[in-house]
């Protein structure tokens, strides 16, 4: 059975605030284990903008927007590639239909102007930054000191994909149908994060821009 979180835009808005836990929980746990102040752990996620020049911040924002737009244009190509050329070839069209039919939908149904504006603002302020803080800032930054960076990126992308097709909420058909799509975007966002020297700003803006474009179009 499909889970339609967007059926009531107001509920979708409220649920979105839960993503703040992606920042609070790992920071609290890390602060407890490593005996660091909570704020230090938050900054280590990539939120530290100390000594950042306005020009650099604006360049990162601009780069993030451009990358997000690029991601939007390749998103449908990626989805088509995985579904038609891989999943359908291996499991058949019926498998994909079941996978799509049981997916979690976060597309708001008939939102009014205020609801749509709030959802866009939430993408910018909460969804993008909080997901990037955990999957990139926390997972990559904490694991890269123990394993090779490539393994940190793979771990981050795997967790990112699993979060979007959670095994305890969707069937195996949905996981297999969409896993490659989300895993690929996990890799791409990780590369953005690493390329900008572990700054959350570009990957967060790219993530938010992609989500907003998918929300609108």
Task: Describe the role of every protein-language-model region.
Residues 22-26, 67, 71-79, 156, ...:
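Alpha-helical transmembrane segments of multipass membrane proteins
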Residues 1, 8-24, 62-68, 153-159:
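Alpha-helical transmembrane segments
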Residues 113-217:
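Transmembrane helix-loop-helix hairpins at the membrane interface
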Residues 29-33, 73-82, 161-162, 191-195:
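Hydrophobic membrane-targeting alpha-helices
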Residues 25-40, 82, 86:
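Membrane-water interface of transmembrane alpha-helices
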Residues 5-11, 40-127, 145:
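Juxtamembrane helix-loop-helix connectors linking adjacent transmembrane helices
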Residues 8, 36-37, 171:
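Helix N-terminus capping/helix-initiation residues
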């Amino acid at each position: 059975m499909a889970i339609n979180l967007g059926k009531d835009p107001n509920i979708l808005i409220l649920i979105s605030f839960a993503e703040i836990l992606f920042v609070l929980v790992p920071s609290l746990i890390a602060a407890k284990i490593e005996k660091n102040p909570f704020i230090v752990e938050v900054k280590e996620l990539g939120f530290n903008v100390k000594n950042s020049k306005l020009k650099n911040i604006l360049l990162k924002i601009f780069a993030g927007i451009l990358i997000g737009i690029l991601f939007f244009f390749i998103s449908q190509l990626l989805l088509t590639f995985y579904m038609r050329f891989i999943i359908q070839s291996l499991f058949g069209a019926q498998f994909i239909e079941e996978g799509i039919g049981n997916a979690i939908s976060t597309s708001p149904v008939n939102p009014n102007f205020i609801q749509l504006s709030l959802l866009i603002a939430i993408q910018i302020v909460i969804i993008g930054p909080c997901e990037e803080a955990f999957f990139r800032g926390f997972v990559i930054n904490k694991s890269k000191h123990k394993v090779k960076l490539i393994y940190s990126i793979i771990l981050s992308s795997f967790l990112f994909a699993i979060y979007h097709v959670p095994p305890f909420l969707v069937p195996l058909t949905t996981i297999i149908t969409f896993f490659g799509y989300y895993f690929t975007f996990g890799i791409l966002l990780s590369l953005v994060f690493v390329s900008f020297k572990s700054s959350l700003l570009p990957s967060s803006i790219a993530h938010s821009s992609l989500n907003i474009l998918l929300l609108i179009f």
